[in-house]
Amino acid sequence: MLIMVTGVSGSGKSEYAEQISCQLAKDNKKYYVATMYPYGEEGRSRVKKHKLQRDGKGFETIEQYQNIGGALKGCKRDTKPVVLVECMSNLLANECFEENGHPDNIFAECMQLYSECSHLVIVTNEVFSDGCEYDDSTTDYIRRLGELNVKLAKAADTVVEVVYTIPVVLKGDISYVGN
């Protein structure tokens, strides 16, 4: 199953995506694919917060800042794992603004990763409603994220927007997620 979880910063989407991943994995292997470079104090603080949030949930962390399709390369697997990717906005920024980036390959690489898992949970951000105008490179990034999110939503079995920690189903079903 391919599940996309979206929401604004601080909405609770990460914790919800972890809950879904744990429910789906049961006793199966779970990987948390971290895509954010921990730049500066804010970045390090966010990484620390997410690590504490995952503590004790059985995730093995993979840091994969680009080329998401290769995230499981080198991982020993007896069965197909559950994979949680956190998050598309960071991955896209890395592919757009870092050396040797390939932003146009992200969707295909996500589908490659999906073919290697039993379930893929992808977290993305809702950054489209602030009403601000930006420079050309930021506008291009926001456009690309929108296009990527549309492709992922079309491919996904389930799409959930988390609003103030409340999951709102936009597509599919979440009855498999316990309270």
Residue ranges and their predicted role:
Residues 1-2, 78-79, 173-179:
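Short, Lys/Arg-enriched, disordered terminal segments
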Residues 2-75:
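Conserved P-loop
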Residues 4, 82-84, 121-123:
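Structural motif
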Residues 17, 50, 84, 125, ...:
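Residue-level signal for inorganic ion chemistry
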Residues 28-31, 81, 119, 158:
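Residues at the starts of beta-strands that form the adenosine-phosphate
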Residues 57-105:
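Helix-adjacent hinge/juxtasegments
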